[in-house]
Amino acid sequence: MTGLQAAILGGSALILLVLALRLGLQRHLPRRLFPALWCAAAVRLLLPVSIPTRLSIWNLFERTSASAAAGTVSRTLLPFPDLTDGAAIEAVLEAPARVSPLFIVWLAGTVLLAAYVSTGCIFMVRGFRSAQIAPCPSMDVLLDVFRFRKSPRIRATSSRRAPLTFGVLRPVILLPEGLAAESEPFRLVLAHELAHVKRRDCVRKLLFTVCLCLYWWNPLVWCMVILAGRDMELACDEAVLRALGPGCRKAYALTLLSMAARSPAPAPLTASFSGSSLSRRIRAIARFRPVSKWAGVCAAIVFALSACVFSTQAALPAPSGQEPVVPEPL
């Protein structure tokens, strides 16, 4: 199995594991756990290497063919081709390189999708450069609540895409111009965007976007990107309610409805106060209750063990009683 095949199979297996965990235990686990699990699946897709472990389920399939594989070692290494045959070497060098049509299709899809995302981000950033610095009298309190050491840049804009957060290295929070600085919606919207910055959701979206550009042909990756975006919003909702207390649930839900009514679809590579899966988010806010950290720890351990079983490759010991074949020097 090649490294690329291992990455595709391992990453797809992790996506299926997260889907199963999300389907069965989503209400009983911390919301912040699921974006982290999606990131683990994305990282596995971007690592084209084999990760052999003795826990891998592939060991069950490889053991049956271990003896056959050991018997073919000498045939794969020996005999060497006659490197002194000039005609053979010339024929190999002059053979035309053939490019697979599937590779051309994949490359075209990757380039088009990457160009679409990049163009959207460039136009978005250009439109936000003229945004004014927003007055933030409630900023210090929220920075202390979310334990920020340095304040992110906060600006006000007339764009309908606001509120949102963009920027990987230096995040910028964009708030709507119409929000009064001392109002409750201003405080709740700012808290939500600060949660995005604290959780580095723009970095996560960049990771998912790279995976989507490379694996656009894999429906599981599309599923991962869509659900990861929803889970990041749910995790930020949970972070706001944990920080400000369950007493703000009604005001927070009303603010979410008002912001979703004015905002279009979220821009790529941004974390926004969007209305994606609005009814699901409202229900989650209404049912919010603090979840024990131990539940998340136990789920993470189960996920890690399952990942070792399903997303790693077989680790076979060397065949006993056989000497390794060493090629003779030419």
Map each language-model feature to its residues.
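Internal/C-terminal transmembrane anchor helices
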Residues: 44-47, 289-317
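Active-site scaffold of zinc-dependent metalloenzymes
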Residues: 161-183
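Auxiliary, metal-adjacent structural segments of Zn-dependent hydrolase domains
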Residues: 119-164
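Cytosolic-side transmembrane helix boundary signature
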Residues: 14-28, 268-298
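Hydrophobic, aromatic-rich membrane-embedded alpha-helical segments
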Residues: 45, 50, 167, 173, ...
